[in-house]
Amino acid sequence: MISNPVKRYCLAKLFPVPRLFFFLTIFLLPWVLFAQFTYQIDQSIPVEVNGNLLAFPWAGGLNSAQLNTVDLNGDNKPDLAIYDRGAAKIFTFLNQNNKWQYRPEYEALFPAEVGQWMLLRDLNCDGKKDLFTSDPFGISVFINTTKPGENLSWRPYNPGFPLLTKGFSSNINLKVNESDIPAIDDIDGDGDLDILNLKFVGTGTIEYHKNLSMERTGRCDSMQLERVTQNFGGFEECSCGKFAFGKTCAQLGGGRTEHTGGKTLLTFDNDNDGDRDLLYSEESCAFVYLLENKGTKDLAVMLSSSVFPTSTPIAMSIFPAPYLEDVDFDGKADLLASPNVYARANLNNNNFQNSVWLYSNTGTTQSPKFSFSKNNFLQGEMIDVGDYSVPAFADYDADGDLDMFIGRYARQDFIGTVYQYENIGSPSAPAFKLITNDYANLSQLRSFNIKPQFADMDADGRVDLVLTSKNLKNGRASLSFLSNRTNQGMLFLLEFVTSIAFNVGGTENILINDINLDGLPDILLGTSDGAIEYWKNSGAADSINFTLQNKSYLGLGASTSRQNPALAIADLNADGNDDLIIGDQRGLITIYKNIRSNSPTLIASTDILYNPLLKTYATKSLGSKAQPVAINLFNTDKPAIIVGNSTGGLYVLKNEEGKELPPDPVVLIYPNPLPSADELSIKPDRNAQVQFFSILGQKVSEPTFIPANQIFKFAFPKLSRGIYIARFTINGKSSAQKFIIN
């Protein structure tokens, strides 16, 4: 905000008073509003797993990665641009001294139209890769227009129109099923790009669209396509792994051709004979098949198929898609594979923790030989619990800092667990170490889609572990909590699970929070239609009973862009008021300021993430199904936002304006004196532990952890009137405040 008197004076000199008011109202007010919520993606927090520090732990996870190399920063080195189909999001990694470094700021440089699939190929032979992607009417193409010293830029190849090809007699759209990935390569070896795609309808054959640019102009600067055959290679796919070579599926005895589901194609010269061989995969198959070209570059003939590579075949639950890019910096294209799926497919699910397979090229460029290297390329250097990560924080070891917990959707046996990371750093410089991938043995509950959070549900002054999950047997979602069985830290035992009578949809999200500040935990429910419902706890301190109070809390009713919103509440801008954070299906974060202001209109802040490359604030997808939690990780007056997502990773959004807290803590304790029938409210400005004593030093409670800037309420029905002491332990130092019960 404009608080410097010199700045105010300068503006007054430039504008007469009416114009100044207009300028401030129209132009500066939005900046003032949004500047209160300004964040950067932070990657500074170290994370240790099995004794090793992860290279980029906060990169967000990967599921269905489509891998391409491209020069992102103009240093003439190939970087990585990955489109994740499940997240509908691009991930960018820079090549820094032959090591990959996650750099999310480059993701904003790609066209917003990218969807379903993305292939980067040099269309016009200028040494810069151009972009091909899915279009509702076929294929969209964007030309790389980047100039030296400038950011990556693009222009549409044919603005407003998809890629065309000459059919039987005239130009038509080159149609590609949205689940398919075509092969875009120089099939005939003449120097320009041709396209292979599965026939859009009918038999399972491949169309060959030959580019006549070189033949007509002698230049490879355009896509002058003509469909020369609808049966490239002379074969049909009949079913998973079954092909009819030189005949139809009916002639083979395989019955009617099965063309449902997606297909992926990738061409390369596997045997160094000067023509293009084919890698083929399809949605219902676990393998990638090699079909060697026994013909020529001008007339392909496929006669057999085999799983590929021969030694250690690509084998995923469903729909592996292959890619060829040099990712180990030796100048030779390596083989990579990742499932080309949106998400899980019921119980037949891919292992999304290990879903990017790398086969290093130990041969040559001309005669490649692919040797299996790892099944978690990039994933092994980031937090990636598989899919649908849900973060939560609490001080489980009572050492004064916040430890991290991550709910995962399911293991390969379709049982969900919670990951536990101990904070081995400090309150202002966190560092996390993986302790277990099955905290509290929650796998024994035989549930999946576990979403953890911490709240005192039984009014004993200790945080309990609250779980939303689905039952493996019947698929129903439920709400329950594990009661904390220790006064020092946290101890959760499965025999102390309490089910809560509350109906929740399988994809809906619950936030436990004291909405009406009566000392009881209430519920905000993010529903499947995008509405946010407020359910008041109308029970007593030791008996929970939720009743619906508002079907459109804060006026947030049904919205197709906000389906299944995930929610968090915290004072984000240090103004003493709670704000609402919403993560939505698209992966976007929206903040509503001061939710208890009773304002008839609430302003949504969405352009909250700073891009240091573009020097702008913008809305940014953090992967679909964003799951936010606000927590003070850096010991500042403004908490960070940690976001989980569909790809199983995490992002840390650090508040740019957060100021380091002063050396002396500030703890609000009220009312003081305290009427004996009331509750004592405590709000510390940083993470604190509180314990109560009589004036004679007798202990009257066990220690309780209070997160920064959150109000905790304490009742003392059994204490007599008199003076008592609240002793606080903050960052290893103790302080005390007196209060009176009268």
Language model: regions and residue ranges:
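Bacterial Sec-dependent N-terminal signal peptides
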Residues: 1-40, 736
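Generic cytosolic/nucleocytoplasmic N-terminal low-complexity/intrinsically disordered segments
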Residues: 3-6, 12, 25, 422, ...
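N-terminal compositionally biased, intrinsically disordered segments and leader/signal-like regions
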Residues: 3-6, 26, 499, 617, ...
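Intrinsically disordered/low-complexity terminal segments and short unstructured peptides
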Residues: 24-25, 605, 635, 703, ...
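Beta-propeller-forming repeat regions
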Residues: 36-663, 673
